[in-house]
């Protein structure tokens, strides 16, 4: 990508919300020891060719072949389709804490003071699609009387009407993204982050031992905003994104949309995925994708799950 600057270091790389140990993988895909230096790669702007996989070989890849809006379509589809695990466990700025995330159940007290729900899709068998409220150019009135109403497109979290104060916008994707709207992409080992509006979106390669989730964290950039929060998005199945964004649109019908997988954590080495670009499907252990079913032994690495139609030859 012409807009990338190689070799610089920064402290703004994607974090690890649960402080899990992850491998250090350099730009050639080699695992580095703790004694070796691993520099970050900075992208001041995302070009229309959104392909950070040269820096993150064992995790997600994004392609944009002959489609100037691929980055826009990817981000729009990503933020609108994966589940969001929202934790409202404390008061004020302590409402959303990574350490309090519950990955296996929904907890809601009668007084609404503790809320932990997957806001869209299914997380560990909990399906709550009605909890998402989408704003596209609508007026949202602040809960504070002396603040003006604002027009904020975005995805909001809906809880019972008697508690309107918690009806907050989580992120503002809008409908007209361009690659230039997404800036400050930093690729660091097996993690990367980028800025989207007032949020820092961070992908990490950690995998929950009992869930097999890839982590996505949102962090508010405005320190003066009392409602800023850190959220963890946990897609249990990357296949939904693949079907949504991976249509065969190449010159020979090859799939050129979202290509994804998880890997890199030493505790889940079997979850590594290998993408066959000339075949149009992903191979790997089914649990890598959050899919149902059992898989044990060496055959896990050979298991195939077709996430896209085969290319047309």
Swiss-Prot record:
Organism: Mycoplasma pneumoniae (strain ATCC 29342 / M129 / Subtype 1)
Highest taxon, organism lineage: Bacteria
Region of interest (Disordered), ranges: 1-44
Skewed-composition ranges (Low complexity): 1-16
Family classification: Belongs to the adhesin P1 family.
Lineage: Bacteria, Bacillati, Mycoplasmatota, Mycoplasmoidales, Mycoplasmoidaceae
Residue ranges with Polar residues bias: 29-44
Name of protein: Putative adhesin P1-like protein MPN_202
């Amino acid at each position: 990508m012409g807009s990338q600057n190689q070799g610089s270091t920064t402290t703004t790389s994607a974090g690890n919300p649960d402080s899990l140990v992850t491998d250090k993988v350099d730009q050639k895909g080699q695992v580095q020891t703790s004694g070796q230096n691993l520099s970050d790669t900075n992208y001041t702007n995302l070009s229309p060719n959104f392909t950070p996989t040269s820096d993150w070989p064992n995790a997600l890849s994004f392609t944009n072949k002959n489609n100037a809006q691929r980055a826009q379509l990817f981000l729009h589809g990503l933020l609108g389709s994966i589940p969001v695990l929202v934790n409202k466990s404390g008061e004020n700025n302590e409402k959303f804490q990574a350490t309090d995330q519950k990955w296996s159940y929904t907890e809601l007290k009668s007084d609404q003071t503790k809320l932990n729900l997957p806001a869209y899709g299914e997380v560990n068998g909990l399906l709550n699609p009605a909890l998402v409220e989408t704003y596209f150019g609508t007026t949202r009135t602040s809960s504070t009387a002396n603040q003006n109403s604002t027009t904020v497109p975005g995805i909001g979290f809906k809880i019972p009407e008697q508690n309107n104060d918690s009806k907050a916008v989580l992120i503002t994707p809008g409908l007209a993204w361009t690659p230039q709207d997404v800036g400050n992409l930093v690729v660091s080992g097996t993690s990367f982050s980028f800025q989207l509006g007032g949020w820092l979106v961070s992908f990490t390669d950690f995998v929950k031992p009992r869930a097999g989730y890839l982590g996505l964290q949102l962090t508010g950039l405005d320190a003066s905003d009392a409602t800023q929060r850190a959220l963890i998005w946990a897609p249990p199945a990357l296949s939904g994104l693949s079907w949504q964004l991976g249509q065969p649109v190449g010159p020979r019908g090859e799939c050129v949309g979202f290509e994804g997988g998880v890997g890199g954590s030493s505790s889940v080495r079997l979850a590594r995925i290998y993408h066959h670009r000339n075949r149009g499907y992903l191979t790997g252990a089914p649990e890598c994708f959050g899919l149902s079913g059992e898989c044990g032994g060496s055959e896990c690495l050979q298991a195939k799950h077709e996430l896209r139609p085969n290319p047309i030859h």
